[in-house]
Amino acid sequence: MNKKRIITMGTAGLCMLMLTGCGGKDRKTYDQAVADLEQGSYDYALEGYKSSITAGYKSAESYRGAGIASLHLGNYQDAIDYLTSGLNDEKAGKTLKKDMLAYRATAELKSELFDAAMADCQTIAEDYAMDADTYYLTGCVALAMDSYDEASSNFTDAYDADTSYEMAIEIYEAYLEKDMEADGTRYLETALKTEAKTADDYCDRGKAYYYMQDYSNAKKELTEAVNKKSTEGILLLGMVYKAQGDTANARAMYQQYIETEGSSPAKGYNGLALCDIDDGNYDNALADITNGLADASTEEMQDLLYNEVVVYEKKLDFATALSKIQEYLKMFPDDENASKELIFLQSRNGG
């Protein structure tokens, strides 16, 4: 499932926000919320930030944190409301306001409130210094509004400001969501002209070749990444093998990822489930999904639960598939593909 990247503005700010002015219970609650947010425990982070808001402790920062947590949980209107409250907080400084504007624009983009998202992007451009992330965000909003020239201009500025493999891949993925891969491929090609230095570089190069369906070079780069101890490289190698229809080697990579990753194996189990689906081993796929859900983040849970629906469809158990997609949409109501799937399953169940 393709999901738009959540813009991670001001990641250094998370560390800065750990500095607190006084001790006691309120400080501990706030600090724990910050830690939970960094670790991807968004439900816990949200509860902590809500407690901080109620206590009036670091209110602007707490509204920001609650907004980000809600954004990751898929509660986009809640995210907008929290971030708006933070922006209206008289204690919010200029840097924090820019950060919250960017997150609010992201939530508005995901809610398809494109005019509001673009208005926030324009406020950032008028009142603050633009950077690679804000150019990228503006490009995503423009692309969603079918303003292709404006999107291209902002993506070019984003890549000029940050010529990393990661930025090139993110721009490509934005175009991929609009079925405009050709427009994004040039960024991948440009990035691949630079020399890899680190494990992350080799991993990103492998991902770029994977998107370009150059699986031979993808395996070469990812093997080098794995040799440099990249666990993500193992996962991506599994994706490359699966794309080639080699589920045996894909399965071996996903199993290696699970064993290497240890505390966060959900993506590996999801990969195993996809291999089992391809091989027609549907009960095994359900077992893999169950194992993955035990330690899944919100984003990982979304993939696993959606694939669970797919498995029940493959088993021709449309009643269970319908029940599962209804549960899924309660958690992720903005997933358009799932909404279409609901209509299909209702038709198969006489709805």
Where are these regions (language model features)?
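Short coil turns that delineate tetratricopeptide repeat
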Residues: Y57, K91, T95, Y128-M130, ...
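C-terminal motif of bacterial Sec signal peptides marking the signal peptidase cleavage site
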Residues: M18-G21
